């Protein structure tokens, strides 16, 4: 009996020494729109885990979807996937309830994937608020879009390397951003961004961010790309640059802090949206 108790005790001690598996956030969300009597209406809605989607009332023909990560932020090992489809002849604006915060990762890398599609004559505007990367955050982000030849697409992705107003900075960590955009079945835009290791040292280089800690990439695919180019360049000034070719307009801007970046983004987004403002949640 004594030897049996000792064996049980030893087994329990061994189990107690095993590391506890940390809980990770998982989420999947999908929205699809359809045209009903000239207005964009909900066709499909799916949400699972920490991924939530809310649909505020609008007073226009476009539908608006607000993406919510109910876990409150991301850390190593978290995984969220969003899918948004604008059906034929519809207009869909997708944004987020707040800035996505990516916290220090004790292990693993957070993953966020967005899969976008737009049907014939559709407009899809992907306008999430900024992603804030805290020190030692680790994030792998991917944006994929499959667009009909006659559709219009706007994508904005803004990043803050810490919050300057709070005295925070991302000095070390990992941020990988991958875009794959297909238009009419053809790959028209592909890019890879990688900030890894000594992030502050890397972004201080003149050829990278020259010490700026807020930056954004904007992509417009549509019939007005050439006409918009000089207007976008006038807004961006020395804080960014823009290029246009074959119906695609790419804009990159950077700033010293998040507030200064927003002062650039608001008029640029409005111009790309033919005068329509940014979603209201951006102003809250």
From Swiss-Prot:
Record GO cellular component, one term: cytoplasm
Coiled-coil annotated residue ranges, if any: none
Any one Pfam family match given in the protein's UniProt record, by short name: UreD
Keywords in alphabetical order: Chaperone, Cytoplasm, Nickel insertion
Localization per record: Cytoplasm
GO molecular function: nickel cation binding
UniProt superkingdom: Bacteria
Main location group: cytoplasm
Region (Disordered): 1-28
PANTHER family for the chain: UREASE ACCESSORY PROTEIN D (PTHR33643:SF1)
Chain's role: Required for maturation of urease via the functional incorporation of the urease nickel metallocenter.
Assembly and interaction partners: UreD, UreF and UreG form a complex that acts as a GTP-hydrolysis-dependent molecular chaperone, activating the urease apoprotein by helping to assemble the nickel containing metallocenter of UreC. The UreE protein probably delivers the nickel.
Family: Belongs to the UreD family.
Descriptive protein name: Urease accessory protein UreD
Source species: Agrobacterium fabrum (strain C58 / ATCC 33970)
Name of the gene: ureD
